[in-house]
Amino acid sequence: MSSSSSHHPEFASCTANDDEHHLDEFELELVVQDVQRQQNNGSANTDQHERENLLLLDDSSKSGALKRRLFFDNLLKNVQDDHIRFLHRQKERIDRVDVKLPAIEVRYNNLSVEAECRTANGDHLPSLWNSTKGAFSGLVKLLGLETERAKINVLEDVSGIIKPCRLTLLLGPPGCGKSTLLRALSGKLDKSLKVTGDISYNGYQLDEFVPEKTAAYISQYDLHIPEMTVRETLDFSSRCQGVGRRPKILKEVSARESAAGIIPDADIDIYMKAISVEASKRSLQTDYILKIMGLEICADTMVGDAMIRGLSGGQKKRLTTAEMIVGPARAYFMDEISNGLDSSTTFQIISCFQQLTNISEYTMVISLLQPTPEVFDLFDDLILMAEGKIIYHGPRNEALNFFEECGFICPERKEVADFLQEILSCKDQQQYWSGPNESYRYISPHELSSMFKENHRGRKLEEPIVSPKSELGKEALAFNKYSLQKLEMFKACGAREALLMKRSMFVYVFKTGQLAIIALVTMSVFLRTRMTTDFTHATYYMGALFFSILMIMLNGTPEISMQIRRLPSFYKQKSYYFYSSWAYAIPASVLKVPVSILDSLVWICITYYGIGYTASVSRFFCQFLMLCFVHQSVTSLYRFIASYFQTPTASFFYLFLALTFFLMFGGFTLPKPSMPGWLNWGFWISPMTYAEIGTVINEFQAPRWQKETIQNITIGNRILINHGLYYSWHFYWISIGALFGSIILFYIAFGLALDYITSIEEYHGSRPIKRLCQEQEKDSNIRKESDGHSNISRAKMTIPVMELPITFHNLNYYIDTPPEMLKQGYPTKRLQLLNNITGALRPGVLSALMGVSGAGKTTLLDVLAGRKTGGYIEGDIRIGGYPKVQETFVRILGYCEQADIHSPQLTVEESVTYSAWLRLPSHVDKKTRSEFVAEVLETVELDQIKDVLVGTPQKNGLSMEQRKRLTIAVELVSNPSVILMDEPTTGLDTRSAAIVIRAVKNICKTGRTVVCTIHQPSTKIFEAFDELILMKNGGKIIYNGPIGERSSKVIEYFEKISGVLKVKSNCNPAAWMMDVTSTSMEVQHNMDFAILYDESSQHRDIVELVEKLSIPIPNSEILSFSHRFPRNGWIQLKACLWKQNLTYWRSPEYNLRRIMLTVISALVYGVLFWKRAKILNDEQDLFNVFGAMYLGSTTIGSYNHQSIIPFSTTERIVMYREKFAGMYSSWSYSFAQAAIEIPYVFIQVVLYTLIIYPSIGYYWTTHKFIWFFYTTFCSSLSYIYVGLLLVSLTPNVQVATILASFFNTMQTLFSGFILPAPQIPKWWVWLYYLTPTSWTLDALLTSQYGNIEKEVRAFGETKSVSIFLNDYFGFHKDKLSLVAAVLIAFPFVLIILFSFSIEKFNFQKR
């Protein structure tokens, strides 16, 4: 993004063919060939300075990165001042040779956007019942409960022009349609929305070119790959977005300069050449964007997420913007890009955008929530929106005149942006009315919009809309979807995939290490010294081969969660045409081939000779090859499933359907001869079939199995015949071919899924008909203003509060220096984030914590709150004069985190009620608590949406600003003595921010200690605070003291410093303060504000205050409570169970799917094993029934514990927050989590038993039926509690999934199904007894057949069934009572371990 990326209409208009819009590769080479030749060959004719500059082009070395950084450090020493000179130097070079830059003019005429939303009678929230109704829509209609759909106008007949060279501000309250307008103008609207009206770029309709490549929409949501650094993210974006027509501009400029004998500016020439090189791995443009966005300090820091330490919220927001502006687009539509940024950083960034717009002729529309006056004045034009209508669109400096004509006047010292948004509110509008109060009536947005259209400004705006098309032509527009050639796209995506695999090395190493451990265990179980070549041991060899295939198949399951994790970023980049789906899919698949080879090699190297397979090198490699193809086949299938279904719950559901199918028709659990003939097709389409055929004929057709005979048939052939796997050797290669075909098929399916399956659409929620009618009548029935803040003040006064000051002295905080920084030459192994912080927070004094993004504000709050889980803390923190005791401090603390973490399946009111229930003292009765909750909801203006589901960020439920207010409400309702708020107004518009701060101010007056980090406060909000702590980069304080009336104390302090500019009249003092204390000002004036503060009287006053407050008040006692938690254990359990019940009831995706899997599995098993329970002639018949029992117990159990992993992980982050707040003990939470599973598991088991029991034909006696139900129920509970335990023991879903597959394989190995208990080596038999499945199969088989005395033929001998069970399996009916006790003991032991793990382990890195 620079002026050199612009295009030239004059020489573009000279071409008649569209082909000439693309730069010929030969012509490009003429421009940069001297640079690249000298870069590669080191020409002797180039001086040293020039050769160093040539390294800037595409040098990925450490020295190259340093040179690129130094290039801009010298060029842009002070970004705010030097950037405009830099752009002017580029502009002067282009203008000097009369190359005019094209521009984009965007017109929209009578644009309307309509969405459909569901309405429903009664409960409108997603639930098991509502989802079931939806699944049976025909029945629902008969019952008169059909779902209705209502049409919502998101945008309503809006028109206007976005002109180049003019920076446009988009203002309006949340929900007014700003994002929809920006998406519409950039061509990014969802296809499900109904759009009418016209949008054109330079006169061309959106369907005549590629708007996604011509313009860039920058979302308010930050979607990035957590494992990549900032620089890597931008380099990849720059590489994929390409260089546009920068080379063409450079070619024309260079040609004209050469003809005129002009020597170009050396720095500008190097810059323009460097950013014109196609497909550059390391771009100088990245360093430019890092510089102007203030991200160079964290350039080599990983982005991170909720579980990985990374960027701050403000840094991540800037990265979202930087990711798009690093490209060559000429029009930008930016949605709330300043959320989480301080006013100084916002001013610097918007200043750069203003300069780019005005000098380099860009087209920009920027939506902001809380622009300061200084930022507001940077804009040329203004669009004001409300309720989907445009209230004003025109020059910024004429907006006040228009509203004066409408009867509204902006008061003195009132910020214009605040005024413009508040006059749209029915609560705030009257205070700005210029006429007599009695003549005032509320003027709705609809009326204001009509008044604007009738005004001369509105009429003037509409006139050119219907004028002829622009003559600027096509030069500024993009007509190709992709910037890179196919090969370059594959290279870019391949390089990134390799990087991400390297960053995920822990997962791969952990997975392979686990495989090696299982291989060693398997080898020792089937040890060659215990295996001989008789028929019985041939069965064991068959089991070992089956287990090897199963293990290799399960080894790839983490691929699902890893793929799902990257899908949001993929869909974002795909929508911007960074790359094609195939460019992503092929590297993501092909680069995993070495993983398949390594895992298969590890397995076979340990097991082949250890187990005692045929000692032949060729057969060794044949088995190895087969396992490689199996691994690739199933992992390709897993990737396809993840890309198609996109959510963990849905993906694991279909994964287990697939695995169930493979196991059923694989030829081992039920041999082919025992299958119903009409189901043989299933045998031939299962990849496991071909894996079985290939491995068993490779082993059992070896010469050693052809010597001894049974009934004139060799042992090898007999075992193959019994399992229906007797095929000639060439079937090995047929199996290889079939598996290879499945790999190609799944590769293609993966690519097609990514290409054609759209990202999961936002869930807009259903709306009750009653509420919809109320909204439609809003214009005629306006709610009267309520004095919510006074209510909350009175309510809080009824609950006693302890007034406690906080002091902190010489507070330091260090973390281990990230490896990326060490590689870049950072000198020390510890990185200091807080540097000798000293201060005091007092009751009744509202303190603001401010500073540039990354200065350490959140870090300071985390240290004070005790939230840090890593790093090194030094210094003294005292509460009420006594050293802080964390266990008691959390009882009086309310901490509003920057990340809004809530349970997605609760409503707004339920979330607040839950917090009040567990955090208010026990003496507060239920009625008072309910009233208190209602008043808090009204205070933060959530009462109107109290029944709305919280939902998942960026997908459904509450908007960003509503989530922020919910975070505040959840903490305020706890009635804390100390409140720490991390950016409580981020994401709120000015009016909502004022409401929140007003409420906080009133709360503070009741004797609470309150501190808020805050960005971009308006003058009114800033002066609502009493004291200020101002920080700079490096975690240092540069001011700590009172703000003063009209900010007099702060202004007085900084104006005394030599070189600091005086504050202007009507200037926002907070913005002025941030501006004059910026790093660039320190460099310009050669000063350090932290040192100046340390030497000031202000600092000495604070030290004295800290010393005074660090001494306990006489006769006071250290803060303590008789109990650790506000509520007793029973109330905790009851509240947690209440919440879990709502969460589970409203999670139909999770619960309905597992019920569906149970029913489907039972039906399929019932058909496959139809009436086989009483067919008992030989050992194979018993093995068939045993296989049915094994499949039934393991399939449903394994799905339960795999599917609960992602489901439980979502709630785990919430649990960390609630547990830190002291809401409940680990035991209460874990017992509630375990208890809520019981009714759902009970339903599963009931359905399974009622279907499978009669289908297979088990014995119909009450005793046997109860035993079957009881065993299946205990087994299912054990499986699901194992899943919960794995979540509590692991840092993320991927590792938990790997351990789950480890558990599954060990369960199978020691269940008695693969190898019966008497044959398990004595050194491993203890694992048999620790395996729940072994007891399950013992109970199932013994309860059915333990008293059956019918004789059967078993391995050439005649025995009764009961004796065979005892001899072969080690099962005896006399042990059933012990088995029953062990079965019920397993769930209880697992619950206790789950509780203990939650108590001891915290994987959240802070």
Swiss-Prot record:
Residues 140-412, 806-1058 form the ABC transporter domain. This is ABC transporter G family member 50. It comes from the Eukaryota. SMART domains: AAA (SM00382). Belongs to the ABC transporter superfamily. ABCG family. PDR (TC 3.A.1.205) subfamily. It is found in: Membrane. ATP 1 binds at residues 172-179.
